[in-house]
Design a protein with these regions (language model features):
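NTP-dependent nucleotidyl-transfer catalytic core
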Residues: 1-238
């Protein structure tokens, strides 16, 4: 095509297309003529609801550059869907349970007490800073997990708002435990014959659906794996 001035292979699996400057000039001229509200707008979606879930960082520390990239990318996808007539819901999935949260709380508690951070804990400077804030703002009865969770989530919200990235829904993984959604999902899987027990654990028959091996949903100690709330989350959405 005339607007492509070059094509080159860049490493295994990558092809770069170089666009002509004239193409960008032509597009900008079209935008000026059509107006920013009318250009490239369509009713393709006809109001169909679409959920775009993105960023979804663990509330165990500040967002990093990779999260920022994901935020911009996800928000761009949401804007494109909206532009094409879809009813878009932007959702942030909060990973607020599990081992990473326990390690985060243990790290914060260790710093507050003046003890070394556990080897598998979080060692960033922010843990030191937040521990100092926690000592200054709270008393000994304060739960480090709940305080740290609120601190991290507040930092996430502030960082995303500074990028003009806003969410319609902040979905807590813990909420599915409180609501019984995980138990209800597991019961539905049992009723469908999609799970079985082996070695004290509950396994998903995922090989029946093209997976290379069956996956553990509930470990032998009764603790759900990361996959179990993911299944419940998708069931909630469908």
């Amino acid at each position: 095509p005339p607007h492509v001035v070059g094509v080159e292979v860049a490493g295994p699996g990558f092809v770069n297309f170089r666009l002509a400057d004239s193409w960008l000039h032509d597009v900008l001229a079209d935008v000026v003529v059509a107006g920013s509200e009318g250009w490239a707008r369509s009713d393709e979606g006809q109001g169909t609801q679409v959920i775009v879930e993105f960023v979804s960082a663990n509330p165990t520390g500040p967002l990093h550059a990779g999260h920022g990239r994901g935020a911009c990318y996800g928000d761009s996808i949401a804007r494109l869907y909206s532009r094409c007539g879809f009813n878009v819901v932007r959702e942030f999935y909060i990973n607020d349970r599990g081992l990473q949260m326990e390690n985060f709380a243990a790290s914060l508690a260790a710093r507050v007490a003046g003890h070394p951070v556990p080897e598998d804990g979080y060692h960033g400077q922010y843990i030191i800073d937040w521990a100092e804030e926690m000592v200054a703002e709270t008393d000994a009865a304060t739960d480090p997990m709940e305080w740290g969770y609120a601190k991290a989530l507040g930092a996430h919200r502030a960082a995303l708002e500074s990028l003009s990235v806003c969410f319609d829904s902040w979905f807590s993984e813990r909420s599915m435990i409180a609501s019984g959604a995980i138990e209800a999902t597991l019961a539905a899987l049992r009723a469908a014959g999609a799970v079985y027990e082996d070695g004290g654990a509950v396994w998903l028959r995922s090989t029946d659906y093209g997976d290379d091996k069956d996956r553990v949903l509930v470990k032998s100690d009764g603790e759900p794996t990361y996959l179990m709330p993911d299944v419940a989350y998708h069931r909630d959405k469908f």
